[in-house]
Structures are given as structure tokens and as C-alpha cells.
């Protein structure tokens, strides 16, 4: 990647799109401090942050959440690796995300949508300021997608800075305020998600879907009224 420059405000939800190999994953991992081999500077509230600082301030939800579910119950998962978690916050989050009935269940016994909600619950409880979601609607049906969209908006209301790597046009229309389009390690487009920008957004997603290497074609659920 090179010549990447942007700013993000608290509460902003930013989509990250582009074909496979365009630089989306490298960018996301660099944001979270998981990619050490990068030049340039990162600032948070005016303070420069190295990769260790970014690790402390960020949380990444992987495309396959099974790789980050380690505990033997949903409740334990929500406190795994978190210092001094507040039980009242855990209880309230499980209730809000409709996970309370499953608090004693093993995460591997849950549906795909429920597992995503567990990952979102952890992101709410851990107290991190920067959240990155990698294809959070991959494999989800329409109802589960809308639930995840609502949870993302809830995190935005909490003042989190959120980046979402996605190919899901309608999910973007329901959650994001702007789109970063990556191509060959560069970021040529930074587009607001508005009705005026709809033709550009359609073109960018068409480019993303038509490039070689796309292993799955998802028919867009986009409705212009959602923008």
C-alpha cells in the first residue's frame, strides 16, 4: 500500500471495498496494529500511535468468527481476555443482543448470526475505541444481516470508530457513512454513502464484484430508499 491518507470521526462507520488483493486486509490489519511492516503515521486524538498502541485501542472481528471464539460458554466468551469486566455491563449487553438465553451455551452450538452477535457483544464489552469488521454478513440471511446492521449502528451511537470490509452493497447502504475503495494497494476513491453518490457507489461495487478472484457472487439486496 502507498499514499493512503484519511481521517475518521468518532461514531463514523466506514466501508472498505475492492477486489481480492486490492489492499483491504493489509489496511485493516495495519489499523489494528496487526501488520507491523508499514511506514507512515497513525494518530488518535492528535497522539501518534505505534502498532502496540493500536493493538490496545482496537478490536477486529474476523470473517470467520469461529477463529476467535475460545471460551466454553457465551458469557465466558464475553469476558475472555478482558481485565476486570463489569458484570452489569456483560448482563446488559447479553440482554440487548438477545443472547441472555444462550449465556451458558457453547459458542460453537450457535447459528452463524448468533455467533456474529457474540463477536459484537465482545466488541461492546472490551471498551476498545476502534473496531474493524471483516465481511460481517458473509453467509448470513437477510434477517441476520439486518440484525448485524442494527448492532453496527448501536456501536456507532456509542462513539466507536468502525471500519467494515465488505462486498455487501445493501449492508453498506444500511450502515456506512462513506466508502473507501482500494485498488492495487492504493485508495483512489473516498465516497459518501448518499443518494447523490449512488451511481458512483454502484460502479465501485460492480468493479469489486467483477474482478478475477471473487469466489462468491452475492446478489445485491440494495434498495435506493435505504440510502
Where are these regions (language model features)?
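H-loop/switch region of ABC-family ATPase nucleotide-binding domains
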Residues: 166-167
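Conserved ABC ATPase signature
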Residues: 106-110, 114
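Conserved ABC transporter NBD signature motif
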Residues: 40-54
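Helix-to-loop junction immediately C-terminal to a conserved catalytic motif
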Residues: 32
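Catalytic Walker B motif of ABC-type/P-loop ATPase nucleotide-binding domains
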Residues: 131-134
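Conserved ABC ATPase "signature" region
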Residues: 87-102
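Conserved beta-strand-loop-alpha-helix hinge in the C-terminal portion
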Residues: 186-209
